[in-house]
Amino acid sequence: MGKKRTKGKTVPIDDSSETLEPMCRHIRKGLEQGNLKKALVNVEWNICQDCKTDNKVKDKAEEETEEKPSVWLCLKCGHQGCGRNSQEQHALKHYLTPRSEPHCLVLSLDNWSVWCYICDNEVQYCSSNQLGQVVDYVRKQASITTPKPAEKDNGNIELENKKLEKESKNEQEREKKENMAKENPPMNSPSQITVKGLSNLGNTCFFNAVMQNLSQTPVLRELLKEVKMSGTIVKIEPPDLALTEPLEINLEPPGPLTLAMSQFLNEMQETKKGIVTPKELFSQVCKKAVRFKGYQQQDSQELLRYLLDGMRAEEHQRVSKGILKAFGNSTEKLDEELKNKVKDYEKKKSIPSFVDRIFGGELTSTIMCDQCRTVSLVHESFLDLSLPVLDDQSGKKSVNDKNLKKTMEDEDQDSEEEKDNDSYIKERSDIPSGTSKHLQKKAKKQAKKQAKNQRRQQKIQGKVLHLNDICTIDHPEDNEYEAEMSLQGEVNIKSNHISQEGVMHKEYCVNQKDLNGQEKMIESVTDNQKPTEEVDMKNINMDNDLEVLTSSPTECTRNLNGAYLTEASNGEVDISNGFKNLNLNAALHPDEINIEILNDSHTPGTKVYEVVNEDPETAFCTLANREVFNTDECSIQHCLYQFTRNEKLRDANKLLCEVCTRRQCNGPKANMKGERKHVYTNAKKQMLISLAPPVLTLHLKRFQQAGFNLRKVNKHIKFPEILDLAPFCTLKCKNVAEENTRVLYSLYGVVEHSGTMRSGHYTAYAKARTANSHLSNLVLHGDIPQDFEMESKGQWFHISDTHVQAVPTTKVLNSQAYLLFYERIL
């Protein structure tokens, strides 16, 4: 009989745990029970030994009023030292002291968790019997040797009496304040607004810095109270015009992430706790994004995006469930007809989430062909703006557009300049280390050619947009000229007189390519960014300035007022036959044309179109002058200027213009074989803000890639306390009064990153202030005031996890900002 094997004994796994932590290999070397038991005899618990010997321990009266740093016990020798969140970091210094054997295992005397400095990770002591016995022994010794309340000396009794006197005085002062508050209307003063520290849950400074700024966003707290109300009834307009009554839905309670966020904001407003532990909120974030689990270095901007996107997804899910319940179907299996109905109601987007109502804005990308001056607009929503930060080296690499020529030398130069962008494609691991230099160079050149061809194909495909991939909105409006199209395709034009501003609409729909003269063709195209982007193609021509807005591309490809569309062999849909009978009165000037094609009353399900003209020169106009910020390269205004600068599309970036392609096919130089050749033209492109968000979040892209390496740009970027966004907004920016030429924002939060990419620390600057009533009315009720409200005064605080300190405004403006939080001044 052989002996039984004991090495292969497995440990039962607890299925209830979400993640299985790896076993630490340093438990045997980091534990010494004999030395630990000797050191714990007659010891003062929860006091740093080094701070005590350095005479840095304060009096007991001061000690009880202030928060103590966390104390960690070395499981090798019993040394007690303050944690890494304190100023001295004696526990970490004790580990770094060179010894023959490592003192790497420490035990927290606050929450009884074990940490290994070598692994830089938490150790589950339940996975090791020896470690579990040591932790249990230390906990028993700590509970036995701590003094009981009855065993107090006279000094402690005197301190308690002083405390009672102070508490009685505080109660009297509170009663006076309550009486004053009853007599006078309640006003939120900055002194009453509290700023509290957040416990570090293990390299979670990136999370704490963002949450400090969100806790100082009063609009978010007010809107979350409205979201949490049970039994909320919301009305959604029907997608079909035949259905006149809106759909009433009853929303369920919000999701777990939203509830955890609301609970966290309420805890931050309580006056009892000095330090808040956001464990529940962080665990909900980790459930949405597993990448934040563990104790690795993370990015605060990514955390903010995952947090906001997660709450927005929960709100959309609430609406979808409410629509299903309204149709009387609560089962998981749905038929196709009901699925299509739910999708149609969801596309209405009449219920924006609270995230979009606070942080949501809109960008408009304007592209104009230099030959036919056709303008197309693409609208994209955003929650924050990521701005480029140019260092001294990248600022010198400027390319002159006039000197660009189609030569092999320029192509090689372009490939060298684009090396940084292709660094993820050309990884070191792709080339074997054992090959010769000649083969390595050959492989690099081949990778460059493939990457360049791939980029060209993506750019060419990116200029065409698939009609069925765009989410659109019905937009019926009263216009100057109405044209009713019957089933035979006849058009009758009626003229009225309205100002030109009445025809420009602020809701955008569509994905219709350019309408030129009597015939037009809609190309099926691909949008590489978002399938739900709303695209507004404003087709402005010098001959017949027309703009087409489609309300439902999927339906218009099937039936356009009785004119069925033909589908080409390559999948493209031609609707030129549907517009052959569309004739305009020659007596009318192009600047006075505005046609609305209404659906026939006898044909249910047909869609609404409108054709509106606009001056192409105003497409690139802004609310205010922007050239002033081109000189100051070290300011946030210059970063916004670079983000919204006017670009020229040349050479490989040329625009595929449908109008010019159509003209060439119909012109004298048309191909005799009937083949249709695409025409690529030079164009101008600019991206501007078309919807100013109530809370503006700016992200400075300091972490950049240089070749195969990653680096951080430590350049100081100046940012003002009052920011005017008007130079970067479109001329017809929404949420801005007509006569206002300023879009002002006030700074209230900064996230700063100090250190390097490998080892850094996030801190926050937050401004405790009174709530902006005009901003609350805009978010809650949609009211846009005519006059500006004065900037709310307050006190700035610097928060580093649990450490909170009041600072002047100059220190805030001199910080190395990574995230900036601005609120709208209305």
Swiss-Prot record:
Positions of modified residues (Phosphothreonine): T557
Subcellular location: Nucleus
SUPFAM superfamilies: Cysteine proteinases, RING/U-box
Residue ranges of the region described as Disordered: 146-190, 394-460
Active-site residues per Swiss-Prot or TrEMBL entry: C205, H761
Covalent link location (Glycyl lysine isopeptide (Lys-Gly) (interchain with G-Cter in SUMO2)): K140
Keyword Flavoprotein: no
Family annotation (PROSITE patterns): USP_1 (PS00972), USP_2 (PS00973), USP_3 (PS50235), ZF_UBP (PS50271)
PTM annotation (Phosphoserine): residues: S189, S415, S552
Residue ranges annotated for the USP domain, each copy included: 196-825
Listed Basic and acidic residues bias regions: 149-181, 394-408, 421-430
SMART domains: ZnF_UBP
InterPro entries given in the database record: Papain-like_cys_pep_sf, Peptidase_C19, Peptidase_C19_UCH, UBP16, USP_CS, USP_dom, Znf_RING/FYVE/PHD, Znf_UBP
Gene Ontology, cellular component aspect: cytoplasm; cytosol; nucleus
Binding site for Zn(2+) 3: C74, C77, H94, H103
UniProt KW keywords: Activator, Cell cycle, Cell division, Chromatin regulator, Hydrolase, Isopeptide bond, Metal-binding, Mitosis, Nucleus, Phosphoprotein, Protease, Thiol protease, Transcription, Transcription regulation, Ubl conjugation, Ubl conjugation pathway, Zinc, Zinc-finger
GO BP annotations, alphabetical order: cell division; DNA damage response; mitotic nuclear division; monoubiquitinated protein deubiquitination; positive regulation of DNA-templated transcription; positive regulation of ribosome biogenesis; positive regulation of transcription by RNA polymerase II; positive regulation of translational elongation
Reactions performed catalytically: Thiol-dependent hydrolysis of ester, thioester, amide, peptide and isopeptide bonds formed by the C-terminal Gly of ubiquitin (a 76-residue protein attached to proteins as an intracellular targeting signal)
Domains (record comment): The UBP-type zinc finger binds 3 zinc ions that form a pair of cross-braced ring fingers encapsulated within a third zinc finger in the primary structure. It recognizes the C-terminal tail of free ubiquitin.
Protein name: Ubiquitin carboxyl-terminal hydrolase 16
Organism for this UniProt entry: Macaca fascicularis
Organism taxonomic ancestry: Eukaryota, Metazoa, Chordata, Craniata, Vertebrata
Gene name tied to this protein: USP16
